[in-house]
Design a protein with these regions (language model features):
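Multi-pass alpha-helical transmembrane bundles in non-GPCR membrane proteins
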Residues: 1-176
Length: 177
């Protein structure tokens, strides 16, 4: 729940900046980021707040898994629509790729899920690492400090996926979150 509030607070700061500089692409990218992040946090909080016997548990688990795709695609949106927009086709190709994965992943997640899907985890990791195909244009487009933050985000996504894949280890799901 704290992540929802913090994310919304910082998101409003980013949106305020976008409106001040009158950059429609930045506003759209940050809006997608906020929708993905808040959607993911709300889905996860709702799912984990329910008792295991709740009739809503399975539906919310599907929403929780689908929302991870939105979070990843949303995280890429400002990068692709702002930073990589002037770097040839890289921004649009990466934007199309991650949102196509998010739509496909959402459809897949809304079907009956196994308790733990390796294909789903690999898809999350693949989406998270997809920026590597445009790493050189990214280095050209943004400051090194921005690249460091993007790398840190990728490391967090991959680390989360590793912890998630250790589902048989005690407390691994708690560490994942």
């Amino acid at each position: 729940a704290a992540g929802i509030l913090l994310g919304m607070a910082f998101g409003m700061v980013f949106l305020y900046w976008c409106f001040r500089v009158k950059d429609g692409w930045a506003t759209f990218g940050v809006s997608l980021y906020l929708l993905g992040m808040v959607g993911s946090y709300v889905a996860s909080t709702s799912y984990h707040a329910l008792r295991p016997t709740s009739p809503w548990k399975e539906r919310l688990r599907k929403w929780d898994h689908a929302a991870i795709y939105w979070h990843i695609a949303g995280s890429y949106s400002p990068i692709t629509l702002v930073a990589l927009r002037g770097e040839g086709p890289w921004g649009w190709l990466l934007f199309a790729f991650v949102w196509t994965c998010a739509i496909g992943g959402t459809i897949s997640s809304l079907r009956k899920l196994k308790p733990h899907s390796n294909i789903e985890t690999l898809t999350y990791v693949g989406m998270g690492l997809s920026v590597l195909v445009a790493f050189k244009p990214l280095l050209h487009a943004v400051e090194v400090s921005s690249v460091a933050w993007i790398i840190a985000e990728g490391v967090m996504f991959v680390t989360g996926a590793v912890f998630y894949s250790l589902h048989r280890r005690r407390y691994s799901h708690t560490v994942f979150h």
